[in-house]
Amino acid sequence: MIFMIITIASGKGGVGKTTTSASLAVALAKLGKKVLAIDGDISMANLGILFNMEKKKPSLHEVLSEEADVRDAIYKHKTGVYVLPTSLSLEGYKKSDIDLLPDVVNEVADDFDYVIIDAPAGLNREMATHLAIADKLLLVVTPEMFSIIDAVRLKESAEMAGTPLMGVVLNRVGRDFGEMGRDEIEMLIKGKVLVEVPEDENVRSAALKKMSVIEYRKNSPASQAYMKLASIIAGVPIYIEDEIKIIRKESFIDKIKRLFRMY
């Protein structure tokens, strides 16, 4: 089986990286692909929480401390996604050896079409390992300057590790009238924005229920955006009923212009 390992990363936290990892995994599974989602941020259990698997034992912690076989720590979710979760245990984290991760991933990667690794945010030793494992890097950013600056640094680190940029997910678009535009972001990162994911309250509601947004509201704007992303990555055409709606907040200047047009 030909497989692809995709590390999903962001230069800073809070941009929706884990949401993107879970949603892309579910979307690829809906397209008939066999997908393994790995909770690569071993100090947290965010991906495991979204799949409601943070209490599973053994977990990646036990695998990285050589207390369990990796195949015993992989669980099939109801969406069809296979998940290698991390636990909430601080002791488990302390016992884990991140240097074992490449061998762990390579042991099972050829059982799947796609391996999605939800990497920790920022630039650190763990991130270096995740970049070295990956065939491709998928960056998640929000349309804000600090998010973009951190993403540029992360992309440069990936290039040094020999990991090419697959593209950029521009997340939470339409939240603020002061946000940067797509063209400006592509110019700064020197990478293509594959999809714009609109600000969507369904994402937060889904997370509270420990679900991906695609499970929660399959026709929501964010769900459609993630299905589009999976379609681009897998090369499988899909039909989206409506154009993805991105409602941008009206700036003060736009409001003044609109008022003048009324007279």
From Swiss-Prot:
Q: Which UniProt keywords apply?
A: ATP-binding, Nucleotide-binding
Belongs to which family? Belongs to the ParA family. MinD subfamily.
Which residues take part in binding ATP? K12, G13, G14, V15, G16, K17, T18, T19
What would you give as a GO molecular function for this chain, any one? ATP hydrolysis activity
Q: Provide the Gene Ontology terms for cellular component.
A: cytoplasmic side of plasma membrane; cytosol
Enumerate the SUPFAM superfamilies for this protein.
Answer: P-loop containing nucleoside triphosphate hydrolases (SSF52540)
Q: Which NCBIfam families match?
A: minD_arch (TIGR01969)
Official protein name in the record: Uncharacterized ATP-binding protein MJ0169
Q: Which Gene3D superfamilies match?
A: P-loop containing nucleotide triphosphate hydrolases
PANTHER family listed in its UniProt record: ATPASE INVOLVED IN CHROMOSOME PARTITIONING, PARA_MIND FAMILY, SEPTUM SITE-DETERMINING PROTEIN MIND HOMOLOG, CHLOROPLASTIC-RELATED
